[in-house]
Design a protein with these regions (language model features):
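Sec-dependent N-terminal signal peptides
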Residues: 4-13
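Short active-site segment of divalent metal-dependent hydrolases/proteases
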Residues: 126
């Protein structure tokens, strides 16, 4: 009996999710602390990947398109060298699509036990994808939640008028999943 309790405790301890420690991450571009285990941000500097790992991040999801000048040349190597797992989804700013969102959902759902950074160049793509994840997968879709998660966009109504492709994407994804 004692062994069973000890074994259960060890299993729980090794699979328990830690929280991201935000104090060391305040200087990351457009960082947004969405929950204890998920943050969104603009592009971290090369040096900040080590800070992210030390703060508890396990997985980095990059939404900057491959070959885009606003990204790092070999971000996968930077992330892996810092001891984290790396995923990339090449999201076209001008033509975001539901397939990319669904791939994002798959990655997020497969890594619910991880502490995650989702980033792009300025935290527009990242916050939009995470908002859609919250709204459709976690069923957290209040007006307050939307405004908080999409805070990097500034005046949301004006921003979505300026970038209508993102309004269309949000409507399509929500219609499909709700």
């Amino acid at each position: 009996m004692k062994r069973a309790i000890l074994l259960a405790g060890l299993i729980t301890a090794t699979t328990a999710q830690a929280e991201i420690l935000p104090d060391a991450l305040q200087d990351i571009k457009a960082v947004q602390f969405n929950s204890a285990n998920v943050i969104t941000a603009g592009l971290p500097s090369e040096a900040q990947f080590g800070k992210l790992q030390q703060a508890g991040v396990d997985l980095v999801i990059n939404l900057i398109p491959d070959g885009n000048s606003s990204g790092h040349e070999d971000e996968a190597s930077l992330v892996k060298a810092a001891g984290m797992t790396y995923e990339s989804i090449s999201v076209d700013w001008k033509k975001p699509n539901i397939e990319d969102v669904e791939r994002f959902f798959s990655i997020m759902n497969a890594n619910r036990d991880k502490d995650i950074l989702v980033h792009c160049a300025a935290n527009y793509r990242a916050s939009a994808f995470y908002y859609l994840y919250q709204a459709t997968q976690l069923k957290q879709d209040s007006k307050q939640q939307k405004l908080q998660t999409l805070a990097p966009w500034g005046d949301l109504e004006s921003s979505l008028k300026e970038y209508p492709q993102w309004q269309v994407l949000m409507e399509q994804v929500k219609a499909k999943y709700q």
